[in-house]
Amino acid sequence: MTLGSIPLATPDLKIADGGRNNWTLVCAPVMAETVDQMLVQMRKAKQLGADLVEIRIDFLKKFSPKNDLNILIKQAPLPTLITYRPKWEGGQYDGNESTRQEALRMAMELGTDYLDVELKVAQEFYSSIQGKKPEKVKIIVSSHNYVNTPSVEEIGNLVARIQATGADIVKIATTSVDITDNARMFQVLVHSQVPMIGLVMGERGLMSRILSAKYGGFLTFGSIEEGVISAPGQPTLTELLDLYNFKQIGADTKVHGVIGNPIGHSKSPHLYNAAFKSLGFNGIYLPLLVDSVANFINAYSSPDFVGYSYTIPHNEDGLKCCDEIDPIAKEIGAISCMIRRPTDGKLMGYNVDYLGAIAAIEEALRASNGATPASVSPLAGKLLVVMGAGGAGKALAYVGYEKGARVVVADRTYEKAKILADKVGGQAITLAELKDFHPEKGMILANTTSVGMKPRIDDTPLPKESLKNYSSVFDAIYTPKWTRLLKEAQECGATVVFGTEMFINQAFVQVERFTGVPAPKQILRDVLVKNT
């Protein structure tokens, strides 16, 4: 099934093309407790850019079927999908099944555009209408799996079962246990011979909701407000349409993303998607919650999955999955960027973590210490304490050593710190020992651990009293911009260097490597300011 072969379910469902690259509909669930509130939500959904609304009548506190359905369907500003989800399929309705199906038949007679009927009762429902379904009304027969995502064969068999009921549209929603679950849904979706909604629920299933447009899904869901969702992992309409530029995603859109765990805090999608849009580049950039890098790379080996940024804790695992590694990344022992070479599909690993961080630290030192010759780094001879021996820690320790700094590596595990310290001719200590480590004044501190990252913004990797011997403190965390560590360092008189500088500078480099053209630097800076 190609994107162009997916029929609009009804001639009454008119969508302004507006240059969109797909016909995957954007549906907003409406889940208010009263009819009036639902009408307000529907108008809001239209303002936000939805193509249709799913009216979840199982959320209504008081429901008078004939009167309420007539108002909701006739006064809706968008085409309607009526869903009356029972508790046994994950909904709110806990009453008589005959009464529920009678309401569904009434919605059909009143002219809703779409009707959701659960697979479990589909044959019973079709028998009850005796072939009297209006041509305008399209029935979505749905199946929801709240435990896992089955094999491709099992999903394919489920499609056949649903199709056999006479469904106009197939809907299958499964649950993500691992991000690779999405690949199985994509495989079924792209080969489906009938209009199909195929979604994977949960945070690890986000990509199924966004890339449904790439693989020919009939529709995807976007919530009207953040947190008010009809299924786990649902993005907002604003995220779908503005952040991910959903209507511009096509079959040939190139997929990029940031690989990490956790990943919800990442601002990378804001920057890279804005850059792609500004440059007219046909790409999408996703947050990728990955448990196993190797499994992810194996599952998404298509030439359209072309580039990734790497963050905690996967910088080192990413390196192991590369076909070729640039010399700096090899020396550091971690990558921050992976690109699929178009000529042969090989995965190339790079490390650009160090670029922004070292430049920002040097700039801060020059500003506080006065001018130094351009040929000499202000880090030369300084004691540089690097907290964390992961990917970013390795990058900073390595480049600090190259700049002439005396490097001390502190990590939770002494052995890990020792391995890195030995590579840069430095000293190793544990993070627990660091609070009492003050051999001299004017030291430089670089935190590359995740301690203090949103949402645990009250945490700090080092107590305030231990910061008095540092002249400059850098924190690789950029959410929040002002971490507790930086606030307390400034109170102690140290010059602070924000993680946003490291983040933005590596973004400049990666955007150019992903797109082949220079990054729109001011746009990226503006987006970062807006989102931190």
Feature locations, PLM:
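Phosphate/diphosphate ligand-binding glycine-rich loop within oxidoreductases
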Residues: T253-A367
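Adenosine-phosphate binding glycine-rich loop
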Residues: L365-R366, G381, S472, A476-T532
